[in-house]
C-alpha cells in the first residue's frame, strides 16, 4: 500500500504531541491576536462563542477556533482517493496549495491561549496552541495543511525575532496542571460558555 494511504505511514506527531509552546517577547494579547490573524489568512474565521471569556476567567488570554467541515472533507477525500490528485501529490508533495488542502480538513478545534512570563511585567508571554487533531481521511492532505499553517506561524515569529526560546512540542502527559487545555477542562469551559449564551 502506498504511504499516501497508509495509516501506519502517516505523520502522527500532531496526534502524539498536540501542544505547541512559544515563549515570545510579546504581551499575551499581542501573541493571541497574531496567532488568530495568522489562522485567518488561511480563511479560518470561526471562533467558539464565549470561550474568550471563559479563558479570561481562568487567568488566560485566549480563544478557540473551529476549523474544517466533516461533510466537505469526506467528499474531497473520496474524490482524491479515486483520482490522479493523490498520485500527483505523492510525487510532488508541495504541488497542492494550502487552499486546496484546506478542503480536506475535518472539523477540528484549535485552542490558542497565552499568559505573561513570570517577572516580565507582562511584556513577554508563553503562547500555547493546542490542535484537537482527529482524522478519518485516507489521504494525508489534512496533516499537510496543519503542518504548513503551524510551520508558517513559527517562521513568522522567527522572522520577527520575537521568539525567546525554541518551540516546544508537548504530549498530554507533559501538560502542566495549571494549563487549562486538558479534555475535561476544555469540556467544562465549553459547557460554561454555552450556558452563558442562553
Language-model segments: what does each one mean?
Residues 2-197:
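Ser/Thr-rich, low-complexity intrinsically disordered terminal regions
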